[in-house]
């Protein structure tokens, strides 16, 4: 086989024409558009970290998703590979595709076994083609079982633009980036089938997140992207803007997928209202503390019932800093609960909730461990792909040397065998790189759920804060009643009554009334948050099982499918070089 005329036909003219291409071997990794150079194989442009790999590979197409992406044929000669997709397509348009050609396509095992599980109904509804499990997870992280399967909402973030802040100063305002947010939906709350776009800056997203956190206490609200001030200074501007665009799109899609948040007025205003965002901006901590310090003297001296917690504010946590006296009272109540000898008037007695809370904590630790192992796996696969690429390039250089020095057919035969081995190694490297990109996308589910664990902890913190408010108000009422009784007893001893004490008694009674109303509102808020926690934990448990099952299916399909592809590549090389084993045995 190796001594055949075809083997001898490893034309030196073609090889000489490609000598310069060997150093920069054009083996398009992503479909032929990006050549694989020695620097790529050595890992100069690769990402070693799992998190950085996620951002750079987020747009790579899922190999499980039909239809397959046409790429450079894996069975083609790497020395003669076309430099672009158009060259490849034109070179194959004039001849039939044989069954022996091995494309970088969805693994055959995956097509046969698991092809139904990776269907993206959302993309079919919206007329778009986005079949990656990563996008599916982002869109379905919080699915509503009660919503109709025909309902959809698709949000895209695109077209970042730099704009100038309006300023009256001579220097001028700062520049900032705005993003075009386009929404396509048929939800009745958004006016039925419609499409609309607005431009928003990152500060608007922060305002939206703050408003949702205040309004929907007890819900597991997906965390917003971080400000990333350091990264904005270190990273390239274009890369940073693109990374933020992707993060904002994922965040808004998660919000729109939440069964409650998707119908919120805040999200509707954010997505629909043109111009400046009409939602009130969040007040910074320093301003809130300053407001609290201004009110503190009146609260301490009890002027006009100022020490009472307003009913309008009892629904929000005291840690915001606007009411320092309430903050001090709840801090004292918290210390009393932990270190005091007396039992608080209301305690957390929901054993089922306490068990779920402990399980969530354990789950978070398990996800952290699994995420670390996933990062190690990605790094190992990346190293294997780079090593295979280096091996292939080394054999290509050796092939070049053998052909330059060849004076007889056996030398050319050996050179041809080395070329086949180099081809197999480079194809295996390409398979490893593609496998790694899909592994990142599938196992990215672990990182997504780490973010959701933060949201769960925030929902539980809302419950604890609401309970602490109830405990503080219940403890304060007996104290106020005792003060009134003492003042009434002292006033009764004075003939005609003590006017100052009578006025103080009236103020305390007004404070008691306000505190009683605040207590009732706080109890209702606490019960509402408890119900929100219960429904959210049930929803997350249900969705986690489905998401983790999809993650494992996709991971296994890719591992088996690409192992099958690489096995076929090496089996072909073993068959082509089997004559050496026969010669060794015969000798």
UniProtKB/Swiss-Prot annotation:
The record's principal subcellular location, in a coarse class, is: cytoplasm
Q: Where is the composition biased (Polar residues)?
A: 42-59, 123-134
Domain called BAR: residue spans: 331-586
| GO CC terms of this entry | cytosol; Golgi apparatus; multivesicular body membrane; plastid; retromer complex
Which SMART domains does its entry note? PX
> What InterPro entries would the database entry show?
AH/BAR_dom_sf, PX_dom, PX_dom_sf, SNX2A/B, Vps5_C
The protein's GO terms of the molecular function aspect are: phosphatidylinositol binding
Q: List this protein's GO terms for biological process.
A: developmental process; protein maturation; protein transport; seedling development
**Residue list for modification Phosphoserine:** 144
* Subunit structure and binding partners: Homodimer. Heterodimer with SNX1 or SNX2A. Component of the retromer complex which consists of VPS29 (MAG1), VPS26 (VPS26A or VPS26B), VPS35 (VPS35A or VPS35B or VPS35C), VPS5/17 (SNX1 or SNX2A or SNX2B).
Q: What does this protein do?
A: Plays a role in vesicular protein sorting. Acts at the crossroads between the secretory and endocytic pathways. Is involved in the endosome to vacuole protein transport and, as component of the membrane-associated retromer complex, is also involved in endosome-to-Golgi retrograde transport. Also involved in the efficient sorting of seed storage protein globulin 12S.
* Protein known as: Sorting nexin 2A
Task: State the organism of origin.
Answer: Arabidopsis thaliana
């Amino acid at each position: 086989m190796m001594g055949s005329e075809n083997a001898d036909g490893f034309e030196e003219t073609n090889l000489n024409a490609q000598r310069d291409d060997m150093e920069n071997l054009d083996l398009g990794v992503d479909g032929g558009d990006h050549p694989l150079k020695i620097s790529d194989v050595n890992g100069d442009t690769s990402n070693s970290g799992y998190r950085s790999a996620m951002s750079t590979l987020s747009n790579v197409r899922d190999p499980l998703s039909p239809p397959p992406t046409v790429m450079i044929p894996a069975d083609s000669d790497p020395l003669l590979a076309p430099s672009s997709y158009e060259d490849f397509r034109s070179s194959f348009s004039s001849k039939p595709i044989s069954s022996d050609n091995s494309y970088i396509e969805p693994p055959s095992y995956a097509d046969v076994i698991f092809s139904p599980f990776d269907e993206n109904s959302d993309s079919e509804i919206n007329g778009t083609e986005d079949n990656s499990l990563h996008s599916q997870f982002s869109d379905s992280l919080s699915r509503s079982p009660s919503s109709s399967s025909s309902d959809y909402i698709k949000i895209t973030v695109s077209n970042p633009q730099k704009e100038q802040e309006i300023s009256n100063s001579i220097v001028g305002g700062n520049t900032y980036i705005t993003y075009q947010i386009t929404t396509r939906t048929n939800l009745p709350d958004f006016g039925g089938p419609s499409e609309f776009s607005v431009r928003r800056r990152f500060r608007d997203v922060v305002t939206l997140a703050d408003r949702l956190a205040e309004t929907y206490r007890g819900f597991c609200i997906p965390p917003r992207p971080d400000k990333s001030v350091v990264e904005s200074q270190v990273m390239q501007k274009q890369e940073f803007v693109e990374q933020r665009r992707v993060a904002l799109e994922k965040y808004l899609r998660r919000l729109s997928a939440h069964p409650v948040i998707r119908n919120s007025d805040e999200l509707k205003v954010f997505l629909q209202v043109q111009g400046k965002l009409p939602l009130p901006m969040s007040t910074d901590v320093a301003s809130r503390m300053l407001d609290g310090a201004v009110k503190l003297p009146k609260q301490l001296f009890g002027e006009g019932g100022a020490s009472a917690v307003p009913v309008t504010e009892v629904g929000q946590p005291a840690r915001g800093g606007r009411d320092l006296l309430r903050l001090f009272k709840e801090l004292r109540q918290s210390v009393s609960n932990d270190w005091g000898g007396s039992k608080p008037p209301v305690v957390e007695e929901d054993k089922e909730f306490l068990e779920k809370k402990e399980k969530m904590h354990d789950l978070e630790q398990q996800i952290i461990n699994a995420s670390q192992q996933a990062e190690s796996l990605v790094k190992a696969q990346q190293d294997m792909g780079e090593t295979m690429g280096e091996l292939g390039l080394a054999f290509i250089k050796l092939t070049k040397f053998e052909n330059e020095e060849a004076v007889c057919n056996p030398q050319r035969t050996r050179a041809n065998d080395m070329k086949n081995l180099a081809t197999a190694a480079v194809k295996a490297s390409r398979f490893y790189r593609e496998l790694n990109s899909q592994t990142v996308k599938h196992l990215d589910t672990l990182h997504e759920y780490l973010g959701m664990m933060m949201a769960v902890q925030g929902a539980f913190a809302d419950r604890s804060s609401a309970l602490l408010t109830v405990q503080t108000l219940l403890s304060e009422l007996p104290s106020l009643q005792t003060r009134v009784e003492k003042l009434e007893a002292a006033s009764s001893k004075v003939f005609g009554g003590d006017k100052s004490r009578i006025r103080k008694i009236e103020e305390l009674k007004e404070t008691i009334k306000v505190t009683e109303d605040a207590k009732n509102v706080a109890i209702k808020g606490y019960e509402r948050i408890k119900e929100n926690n219960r429904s959210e934990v049930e929803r997350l448990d249900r969705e986690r099982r489905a998401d983790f099952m999809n993650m494992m299916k996709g991971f296994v399909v890719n591992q088996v499918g690409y192992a099958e592809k690489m096995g076929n590549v090496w089996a072909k090389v073993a068959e082509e070089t089997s004559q050496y084993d026969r010669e060794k045995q015969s000798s």
